């Protein structure tokens, strides 16, 4: 699969605009971190010892980290010398820089979602982060699979199966809280659904542009879709933080 060279300048321009928007959102979050006082406790337990809070996560600051990771990734991909390397890789149907960015934004986001839904055990949070990041990094392997059909989607399928596990943990905690009469707030519930839908959209886009959108523009279109999904992800995070704050 190849990329139309005429579309590469557009890709760099879109990345530059996206970087500016991510940066603006990140600055809003950092500026509001002082007054948006949502602290999410993290607990550490050992056998026979009650779980005790040993740290807390500032929601606004953590969300700012996610957004600024996207800002830095998109900015560096839009200027030389990395711009040319990214274009060269995309021309070969490979989007390693995108997977590096997504592995961090997706994993930190699902950890924040887990914290908002009451998952506070440090060991569980570390496992959630590792599973989410590892699932996305399998897409780096998927880029190197050229066989059409199901046999060429082994890495994608494994990544999707692994990536849904952290969200399953979140769902389990939501259901448990409903059963004990302590449901999460409407903002947290809506934010969880929105971020889950965007996570699913990222994976669907990978499958769609590989299996259904077979054209000379498929890789460039996939990159554009990823950028737009990333912007929607930032908007959803920003909305959740501001509404909870």
How does the language model describe each region?
Residues 2-95, 106-245:
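Polytopic alpha-helical membrane-helix bundles and their juxtamembrane interface segments
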């Amino acid at each position: 699969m190849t990329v139309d060279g005429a579309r590469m300048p557009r890709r760099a321009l879109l990345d530059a605009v996206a970087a500016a928007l991510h940066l603006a959102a990140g600055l809003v979050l950092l500026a509001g971190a002082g007054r948006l006082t949502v602290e999410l406790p993290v607990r550490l337990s050992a056998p026979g010892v009650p779980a005790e809070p040993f740290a807390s996560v500032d929601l606004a600051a953590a969300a700012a980290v996610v957004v600024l990771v996207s800002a830095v990734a998109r900015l560096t991909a839009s200027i030389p010398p990395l711009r040319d390397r990214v274009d060269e890789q995309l021309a070969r149907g490979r989007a390693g820089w995108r997977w590096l960015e997504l592995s961090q934004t997706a994993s930190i986001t699902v950890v924040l979602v887990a914290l908002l839904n009451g998952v506070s055990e440090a060991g569980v949070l570390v496992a959630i982060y590792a599973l989410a990041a590892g699932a996305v990094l399998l897409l780096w392997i998927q880029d190197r699979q050229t066989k059409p059909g199901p046999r060429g989607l082994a890495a994608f399928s494994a990544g999707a199966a692994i990536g849904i596990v952290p969200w399953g943990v979140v769902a389990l905690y939501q259901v448990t809280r409903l059963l004990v009469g302590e449901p999460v707030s409407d903002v947290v519930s809506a934010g969880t659904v929105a971020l889950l839908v965007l996570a699913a959209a990222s994976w669907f886009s990978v499958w769609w542009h590989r299996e259904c959108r077979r054209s000379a523009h498929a890789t460039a279109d996939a990159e554009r879709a990823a950028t737009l999904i990333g912007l929607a992800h930032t908007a959803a995070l920003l909305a959740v933080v501001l509404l909870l704050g």
